[in-house]
């Protein structure tokens, strides 16, 4: 009977220890994911402040001063005054 009480106590202590280890591991993962998300958002916020050298698709433009991104094959449409994709050239 003493062995059974001791084994039950050890089993219960093992379960408590397993719970504590899992809880600590989970909280570390949450902290890591929160830090990762914060760093990604910080990088995104920094890039918003910088101006691009050229305009992206569907951005308003001036046909006489075409600043649409040439690397993306964009041109300023005289009709709509937006940067659009140039097909065929």
UniProtKB/Swiss-Prot annotation:
Q: What is the protein name given in its UniProt record?
A: Huwentoxin-IV
Q: Which family does it belong to?
A: Belongs to the neurotoxin 10 (Hwtx-1) family. 22 (Htx-4) subfamily.
Description of post-translational modifications = Two forms of huwentoxin-IV exist in the venom of H.schmidti, a non-N-terminally modified (HwTx-IV) and a naturally modified peptide with pyroglutamic acid residue at position 53 (mHwTx-IV). mHwTx-IV shows no observable difference with the unmodified toxin when applied to the TTX-S sodium channel of DRG neuron (IC(50)~50 nM) or when tested on hNav1.7/SCN9A (IC(50)=30.8 nM). In addition, similarly to the unmodified toxin, mHwTx-IV has only a weak affinity for lipid membranes.
**Effect of mutating residue 87 to A:** Small decrease in ability to inhibit both Nav1.2/SCN2A and Nav1.7/SCN9A
Question: Signal peptide location in the record?
Answer: 1-24
Q: Does the keyword Disulfide bond apply?
A: yes
How the protein is affected by changing residue 58 to W?
In gHuwentoxin-IV; shows higher affinity for lipid membranes and a 4-fold increase in ability to inhibit hNav1.7/SCN9A compared to both huwentoxin-IV and mhuwentoxin-IV
Q: In which tissues is it expressed?
A: Expressed by the venom gland.
Recorded hits in SUPFAM superfamilies, A to Z, give:
omega toxin-like
**In the UniProt entry, what is the domain comment?**
The presence of a 'disulfide through disulfide knot' structurally defines this protein as a knottin.
Q: Which InterPro entries match?
A: Huwentoxin-1, Huwentoxin_CS1
Subcellular localization is given as: Secreted
The record gives the effect of mutating residue 74 to A as: Important decrease in ability to inhibit both Nav1.2/SCN2A and Nav1.7/SCN9A
The UniProt keyword set, sorted, is: Amidation, Disulfide bond, Ion channel impairing toxin, Knottin, Neurotoxin, Presynaptic neurotoxin, Pyrrolidone carboxylic acid, Secreted, Signal, Toxin, Voltage-gated sodium channel impairing toxin
The positions annotated as site (Binds to the extracellular loop of voltage sensor domain II of sodium channels (Nav1.2/SCN2A and Nav1.7/SCN9A)) read 58, 78-79, 82, 84
Which residues belong to the propeptide?
25-52
Other remarks on record? Shows a weak or no inhibition on rNav1.4/SCN4A (IC(50)=3.9->10 uM) and hNav1.5/SCN5A sodium channels (IC(50)=>10-25 uM). This toxin has also been shown to weakly inhibit Kv11.1/KCNH2/ERG1, Kv1.2/KCNA2 and Kv1.3/KCNA3.
What is the annotated role of this protein in its UniProt record? This lethal neurotoxin (without cyclization at position 53) inhibits neuronal voltage-gated sodium channel Nav1.2/SCN2A (IC(50)=10-150 nM), rNav1.3/SCN3A (IC(50)=338 nM), Nav1.6/SCN8A (IC(50)=117 nM), and hNav1.7/SCN9A (IC(50)=9.6-33 nM). It inhibits activation of sodium channel by trapping the voltage sensor of domain II (DIIS4) in the closed configuration. The toxin neither shifts the Nav1.7/SCN9A activation curve nor modifies the slope factor. It does not slow fast-inactivation of hNav1.7/SCN9A channels. In addition, it has only a weak affinity for lipid membranes.
Sites bearing Pyrrolidone carboxylic acid (Glu), chain numbering:
53
Intrachain S-S bonds: 54-69, 61-76, 68-83
Q: What is the effect of changing residue 58 to A?
A: Important decrease in ability to inhibit Nav1.2/SCN2A, and small decrease in ability to inhibit Nav1.7/SCN9A
**Per its record, what are the GO molecular function terms?**
ion channel inhibitor activity; sodium channel regulator activity; toxin activity
Relate the outcome reported for changing residue 56 to A.
No change in activity on both Nav1.2/SCN2A and hNav1.5/SCN5A, and controversial activity on Nav1.7/SCN9A
